[in-house]
């Protein structure tokens, strides 16, 4: 019993630290590799352009119609949307989309309008170069140039088209059918028939000054 107590005392008195020699260090597999410092990941920067940048093209929904189809199982509802897209710099388009949901129909209409963009002339960065009258089905529209600062004189449907096209001073008057779709198509038809002074001069084989003196 005395020997056991003495052995236990010897174990308690021993230093718990372990002495490392060169052999034990070499045998350690962790020391054979180079320990690389931990690299901290950089925080992701939020794109500041998304907040400040404006989309190049703006869109406006002209009309949304609900379509009902009668089948054997009952009625099926779908939606038809019409939208106008423009960059206010002479590019404008009109599109149509169909879907079972309103949001999907609007997205398709906007995408269709972006695929149908056309270029229209803007005189002095504000108005049309000359007066023009156009008929589309039962709708008629008259467009006249206006002095700077006058603003847009038009219905809400026509205003959506001319504003997105880039006109800021313009007179318009609609006659006949006031159906929104026909009015939009008549407006676009009129804008596409506009000609600048240089274009008229080339068609008539005149100088720009001579073409400006004549009626377009």
Curated annotation (Swiss-Prot):
Assigned keywords, A-Z: Ribonucleoprotein, Ribosomal protein, RNA-binding, rRNA-binding
Pfam family, one: Ribosomal_S5_C
Ranges of biased composition (kind: Polar residues): 20-31
Single GO cellular component term: small ribosomal subunit
Entry GO MF terms: rRNA binding; structural constituent of ribosome
Entry-linked SUPFAM superfamilies: dsRNA-binding domain-like (SSF54768), Ribosomal protein S5 domain 2-like (SSF54211)
Family annotation (InterPro entries): Ribosomal_Su5_D2-typ_SF, Ribosomal_uS5, Ribosomal_uS5_bac-type, Ribosomal_uS5_C, Ribosomal_uS5_N, Ribosomal_uS5_N_CS, Ribsml_uS5_D2-typ_fold_subgr
Residue ranges annotated for the S5 DRBM domain, each copy included: 57-120
Any single biological process term in GO: translation
Taxonomy, superkingdom: Bacteria
Region (Disordered): 1-55
Role according to the record: With S4 and S12 plays an important role in translational accuracy. Located at the back of the 30S subunit body where it stabilizes the conformation of the head with respect to the body.
Family, per entry: Belongs to the universal ribosomal protein uS5 family.
PANTHER family the record matches: MITOCHONDRIAL RIBOSOMAL PROTEIN S5
Subunit structure: Part of the 30S ribosomal subunit. Contacts proteins S4 and S8.
Domain notes: The N-terminal domain interacts with the head of the 30S subunit; the C-terminal domain interacts with the body and contacts protein S4. The interaction surface between S4 and S5 is involved in control of translational fidelity.
Name this protein carries in UniProt: Small ribosomal subunit protein uS5
Organism expressing this protein natively: Mesomycoplasma hyopneumoniae (strain J / ATCC 25934 / NCTC 10110) (Mycoplasma hyopneumoniae)
